[in-house]
Structures are given as structure tokens and as C-alpha cells.
Amino acid sequence: MGMRMMFTLFLLVVLTTTVVSYPSDSASDGRDDEAKDERSDMYELKRNGRCCHPACGKHFNCGR
């Protein structure tokens, strides 16, 4: 393959992955909400003096 053909193939792959991944961003809104809920649960456990998340588990008892 020549350089021009390889460059064209590279652009085709990049554009295809960009177009394919763009619509899937709208589906992640629900997953983001779930992640926010998990974070709020972590902070609630932290306020109660226990936390099993690695970010705060070293400072608090896991409570298991």
C-alpha cells in the first residue's frame, strides 16, 4: 500500500469511530445519574463514620 492509501484508510477509521461513538454519548446520561447516586451514597456513608470506597476507606471503617 502506498502512503496516500494508508493515510486515507487512517482517516476513514478515525471518522468512522468518531461517528459511531458520538450518538452513544446521549445514552450515557442515565449511567451518569447512577454514578452520581453512588457518589452520594459514598458521602452518606462517610458522614456516618464508615466508608468502603477506596477513596475514603483508609480513613474510616468499612462497617462490614
Swiss-Prot record:
InterPro entries: Conotoxin_a-typ. Expressed by the venom duct. Pfam families: Toxin_8 (PF07365). GO terms for cellular component: extracellular region; host cell postsynaptic membrane. The modification Cysteine amide is found at residue 62. One of its GO terms (molecular function) is acetylcholine receptor inhibitor activity. Belongs to the conotoxin A superfamily. This is Alpha-conotoxin-like Ac1.1a. Disulfide bonds join 51-56, 52-62. Keywords: Acetylcholine receptor inhibiting toxin, Amidation, Cleavage on pair of basic residues, Disulfide bond, Ion channel impairing toxin, Neurotoxin, Postsynaptic neurotoxin, Secreted, Signal, Toxin. It comes from the Eukaryota. The lineage of its organism: Eukaryota, Metazoa, Spiralia, Lophotrochozoa, Mollusca. Alpha-conotoxins act on postsynaptic membranes, they bind to the nicotinic acetylcholine receptors (nAChR) and thus inhibit them. Its main location: secreted.
